[in-house]
Amino acid sequence: MTTLRLLISDSYDPWFNLAVEECIFRQMPATQRVLFLWRNADTVVIGRAQNPWKECNTRRMEEDNVRLARRSSGGGAVFHDLGNTCFTFMAGKPEYDKTISTHIVLAALNSLGVMADASGRNDLVVKTPDGDRKVSGSAYRETKDRGFHHGTLLLNADLSRLANYLNPDKKKLAAKGITSVRSRVANLTELLPGITHEQVCQAVTEAFFAHYGERIDAEVISPDKTPDLPNFTETFARQSSWEWNFGQAPAFSHLLDERFTWGGVELHFDVEKGVITRAQAFTDSLNPAPLEALAGRLQGCQYRADKLQETCEALIATFPEQESELRELANWVAGAVR
């Protein structure tokens, strides 16, 4: 009986693909070696311990309909579009060894005519006249009896968009999260004009088969029907939830300040697991009562633009004479935390 398993996703949904990955990883036999190939439409994928408000331009992501997805492995933030080919290698211990999966990817690139080398712990690079350029980045996860290595191959990614979403507006965040390292990158199409996702997947698959000396048929995972994977529905619900993608951020503090025609405002937030645990408001407004009331109401509020806006606007019932100021404040706060 074969110990290999090959899965290919037809979905471009990052939450779907990461849920599939998680389910396979949890239920696979310890003797199995798995290759999962997939790709995501416009998404910023952050590491398990990262703060999305620090790593990402969340406002621009919302404007451009770019999703946020938190993965279960560590490492930094990356932007995915359909110009990325994603791979995941899984195996039980003691056989799990990320150098094996790295070798398979390097062999696949070599078969396509690209000579690449491993650089540091996570990257694959090619040598160019301008120096080493990164074509692949990886992250890893291990449990007591198994491990996985997942990563991306930059095929024809829109590299201009990397900076759009991974270089956030300067916010006054004093964060405990891990700041991503920005790397010099290159697309494989610069080296292999016309290369396709399907060709890259085929090359990785053939290198996978060659390493283990076995061939198997691929299982196609489609979003058209719920995958036959244990606990997939629950895992997808968690993976797509605000509580996981945003709420799992490390604790951080945020200072907002603005001057309006009616006075200056400073708001200080302490945030844990996406919830405001402490809020302070300072103002030189002639009527500070609405701001003082707001500080109390914000404690326990989710750190979400819509929730903060609702909380600000709810004060209009108590302070109707300050309706215009409160609406202006609500719009500003919502915009500042997007």
From Swiss-Prot:
Reproduce the miscellaneous comment text. Answer: In the transfer reaction, the free carboxyl group of lipoic acid is attached via an amide linkage to the epsilon-amino group of a specific lysine residue of lipoyl domains of lipoate-dependent enzymes.
- How the protein assembles, per its UniProt entry? Monomer.
Query: What CDD domains is this protein classified in?
Result: LplA
Question: Does the record's keyword annotation contain ATP-binding?
Answer: yes
Q: Does the keyword Ribonucleoprotein apply?
A: no
Residues the record lists as binding ATP: 71, 76-79, 134
- Alphabetized UniProt keyword annotations: ATP-binding, Cytoplasm, Ligase, Nucleotide-binding
Q: What catalytic reaction does the record list?
A: L-lysyl-[lipoyl-carrier protein] + (R)-lipoate + ATP = N(6)-[(R)-lipoyl]-L-lysyl-[lipoyl-carrier protein] + AMP + diphosphate + H(+)
Q: Where does (R)-lipoate bind?
A: 134
Gene expressing this chain: lplA
In its UniProt entry, the species of origin is given as: Salmonella typhi
Subcellular location, in the record's words? Cytoplasm
Using the record's annotation, list all stretches that form the BPL/LPL catalytic domain.
29-216
Assign the protein's first listed, main location to one coarse class.
cytoplasm
Q: Which pathway is this protein engaged in? A: Protein modification; protein lipoylation via exogenous pathway; protein N(6)-(lipoyl)lysine from lipoate: step 1/2; Protein modification; protein lipoylation via exogenous pathway; protein N(6)-(lipoyl)lysine from lipoate: step 2/2
Q: Which terms in the Gene Ontology molecular function aspect does this entry carry?
A: ATP binding; lipoate-protein ligase activity; lipoyltransferase activity
For this entry, the protein name equals Lipoate-protein ligase A
Where would you find the membrane-spanning parts of this chain?
Answer: none
The text of the family note is:
Belongs to the LplA family.
EC nos = 6.3.1.20
**GO term, biological process aspect, one:** protein modification process
Function description: Catalyzes both the ATP-dependent activation of exogenously supplied lipoate to lipoyl-AMP and the transfer of the activated lipoyl onto the lipoyl domains of lipoate-dependent enzymes.
Class of this enzyme: ligase
Listed GO CC annotations: cytosol
